Amino acid sequence: MIGWLKDLLKANALDESPVARDRTATPPATTRPAPTGQAGDSVRAAPGETLAKQLALVIDLNVCVGCHACVTSCKQWNTSGSAGPLADERPYGADPTGTFFNRVQTWEAGTYPATETIHFPKSCLHCEDPPCVPVCPTGASYKRKADGIVLVDYDKCIGCKYCAWACPYGARELDETRQVMTKCTLCVDRIYDDALPPEDRKPACVKACPTGARLFGDVKDPDSEVSAAIRERGGYALMPEWETNPANRYLPRRVTRSQ
C-alpha cells in the first residue's frame, strides 16, 4: 500500500502543489517551533526499525460518554503550547473547519428499540509503520526513535497534504492559517516537562477524562497499565487490514445491562 501510494504521488501529486512546482518558493511562515525543534537523523526512526519503547493511548469505549472533555483540553493545551496556536476558522455548523488534534465521533447503532449510542474518540494512532512518513516530500513527517511518537517538523512542512492523503484514519489536518499539517503529538511538550508534577506528565486528554476512558503508557512494556488493559480486555487495533500497526488501541464495549 505504501509503495503504491509513493509511486502515485511521485508520478502525479507533486505537480499539483504550487509550492512543489516552484522549488524556490519560501515555505509558509510558522509562529511556533515544531514540538521537538529541528528533527535531525539522530532522533528519527528508520523505516521498519523496531523500537524498544512505544508510547500510545488505550481508549475504553465502554466508559467513554462523549463529553468532549478530551477534545477541549487538547485544544486548550496545544493552542497555548509548542504545537499552537491552532486555527478556528469555522468551528461550528454542518461543515466545521479548524484544527483539532482529537475528535469524538458519535452515532447510534442497532435497531429500535434495541439501540445504543456509540462514542468513538479518534486522533493520530502513532503507527509502527506510519504511511504518512515516507510520502512526505520534505521529510517533515517523522517517527521518533526514543518513544515512537509520530511528529511534524513545522519548519520543513509545506502543507502539501500528502500525509493526510496517505493516512487511512483521517488523523491529519491542515492548519489553514499557518499552512502546515497538524496532528496529535501525545503532548510531547507536556509528558517530559520536569516542571510539572509527575501525575500531570500525561497527555491533556488523559488528564481531563472524567471517566478514566483514556490510558497512556508504553505498549512495549508488558508490565505497563496499557499493556495489561490490552491483554486483559482484548484491546484491538483500528483497521488492521491497512497493515500500519497502530500503537493506539481500543478496548471494546461490553453489554452492561439486559437488552
Show which residues each predicted segment covers.
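Non-ligating segments of multi-cofactor redox enzymes
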Residues: M1-Q259
